[in-house]
């Protein structure tokens, strides 16, 4: 049986003509409405948004030469930088993670933890870490998301490939998402720019009423929005 039930907790109805043909809805009494869809539609309705609290998660990780369980709630006293990437043993990915590793101390000094995420297993992470000169520098947790569950929640999962897009997410101490960067997989990211965004997000969180202009750096000029500033920039 097909349903036209809107995909929200509050209920309501959705025009069935707007639902893609590859969208299958099945009802189970014990669970309510279950929706199965392609990832491109999933991203539109489930991707976390700026200003929203991130749901706690737990994943296996390769860290300090060991397999560990990592939970978001274990880092409540820190800012968190999540860096999603397509796959181990590839080409752009090791350059990105190497640059993150080289700037890891600066992220920690800013009170943040860095974690990388891909759909590889912990065992593949270990093999990559053992063999790649670039990845041997990595000291931060490398999260394993082989089912793509976390990638789907953050809107980075590519259903047709089983891989993640290049997505970077900055989360504050309260678990609120403050910044997103999403790239095509052919475009590498800058660890220094990610660090700059983290420092800017921290600054405005600690200085109510002030905002950071383009390319702001610590110690640089900030702005205080108000009627007196209108038209003067």
Describe each region flagged by the PLM:
Residues 2, 13-60:
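N-terminal targeting signals for export/organelle localization
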Residues 5-7:
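Intrinsically disordered, glycine-rich low-complexity segments
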Residues 25, 45-233:
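Chalcogenol-based redox active-site neighborhoods
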């Amino acid at each position: 049986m097909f349903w036209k039930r809107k995909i929200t907790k509050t209920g309501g109805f959705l025009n069935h003509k707007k639902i893609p043909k590859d969208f299958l809805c099945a009802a189970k009494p014990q669970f309510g409405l279950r929706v199965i869809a392609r990832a491109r539609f999933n991203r539109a309705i489930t991707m976390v948004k700026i200003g929203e609290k991130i749901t706690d998660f737990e994943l296996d990780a390769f860290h300090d030469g060991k397999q560990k369980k990592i939970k978001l709630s274990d880092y409540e006293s820190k800012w968190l930088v999540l860096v999603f990437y397509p796959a181990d043993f590839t080409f752009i990915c090791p350059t990105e993670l190497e640059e993150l590793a080289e700037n890891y101390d600066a992220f920690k000094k800013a009170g943040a933890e860095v974690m990388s995420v891909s759909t590889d297993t912990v065992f593949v992470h270990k093999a990559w870490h053992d063999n790649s000169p670039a990845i041997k520098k990595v000291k931060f947790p490398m999260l394993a998301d082989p089912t793509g569950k976390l990638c789907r929640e953050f809107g980075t999962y590519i259903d047709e490939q089983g891989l993640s897009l290049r997505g970077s997410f900055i989360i504050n101490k309260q678990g609120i998402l403050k910044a997103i960067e999403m790239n095509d997989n052919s475009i590498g990211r800058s660890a220094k720019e990610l660090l700059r965004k983290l420092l800017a997000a921290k600054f405005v969180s600690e200085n109510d009423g002030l905002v950071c202009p383009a390319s702001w750096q610590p110690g640089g000029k900030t702005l205080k929005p108000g009627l007196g500033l209108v038209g003067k920039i």
